[in-house]
Amino acid sequence: MAKFDAKSFNERAFGKYMSAIPNVKLNKLKESRAIVADQRLRETFVNNGQTGTVYAVLPYFGLIGGDAQNYDGVSNLTPEKTDTFEQGVFTYGRMMGWTEADFSYDVTGGVDFMANVRNQINRYWNDRDQDTILSILKGIFAMASTGTGNVKTANAAFVSAHTYDISAPSTDAVTTDAMKVSATTLNSAIQQACGDNKQKFSLVICHSTVATNLENMKLIAYLKYTDAEGVERDLGMATWNGRLVLIDDSMPVEVKNVGSTGGDVSLYTTYILGEGAIGFEPVGAKVPYEMVRDAKTRGGEDTLISRKRNAVSVAGISYLKTSQATNSPTNAELENGKNWSLVSNGTDCIAHKAIPIARIISRG
């Protein structure tokens, strides 16, 4: 893979070249087990032989339960039935193209240009997938009024119980330490959301302002990795109370005027995910990479085009596809609460405490 050249470009070889480098950041996310492979997605969107499938409704089995009955050699057993719910899952596609001039050269020298291209493309798609996951989470916490009857009530209960708000958004007061994350905030938030299931939480996604606040209190430790050239680099991730922390300045920040005393304050959202919260499965594009030449522009230029398709499921939550214009939802459509609901059987929903997803709202 020596040249950025449409004439000599081999899409299959380049695809193998792209997958040959370890994706350190994605691997760390998978280690947290908050973002996991979902075999149901692969069976539905890859292995079933039906091309063009972009959305599916899958059975979602409830947990067994009921009170144990007395085994005395006399009493008859009355078995319980496990409810079967339905869950909407979906795929999304994204594409982008770059010319050779779009890629920055490694000024330290000694690095093959196409290796640099590969690294930059990997980082680009990591960031875009991260943006999509954040849009999904934003949509989930906007579903309080989705549905009718028991379903609407359950959706509102999820949003309320899984939101730990210490920002005092209606209080006309200057920001105090009590309105910012502290040593006890994380534990309190996950306990409120899931009770004795709180140990399932394994990943925190927060704004750098929140991370800096935690760093100043010596509550987080940053992770590093060694690249292929043996250089130690920042991974842009940390740990907090043994949970992986992903730092992302595209996290929601709302600027709100709380009154004449407090003035404008910034309200930061921090997401917390548990094991299996997001099922994420690359399902492939027909032509994932190709290079085209435009002979008439600026004396001729080559453009590298990259396409991705991923399938997504969210634990205990169904994507409804209520408001989606094309086969692939945009991030704005994923942020629409009307597209999300707790998994249900049409009448009743699963218990929201089984869903390892929560958020903290704070002033820093």
Predicted regions and their residues:
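Extended, solvent-exposed, turn-rich assembly/linker loops in the middle of proteins
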Residues: 145-235
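Long, contiguous amphipathic alpha-helices that act as assembly "spine/axial" helices in icosahedral shell
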Residues: 58, 85-153, 194-210, 295-316
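Short, cationic low-complexity segments
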Residues: 83, 225-243, 326-346
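Extended serine/threonine-enriched, polar tracts that run as long, contiguous segments within proteins
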Residues: 205-212, 217-219, 226-311
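Protruding loop/beta-arch "assembly-hinge" segments enriched in small, turn-prone residues
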Residues: 1-22, 271-274, 282-364
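Short, low-complexity, charged/polar segments at coil/turn and helix-coil boundaries
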Residues: 27-54, 60-68, 138, 168, ...
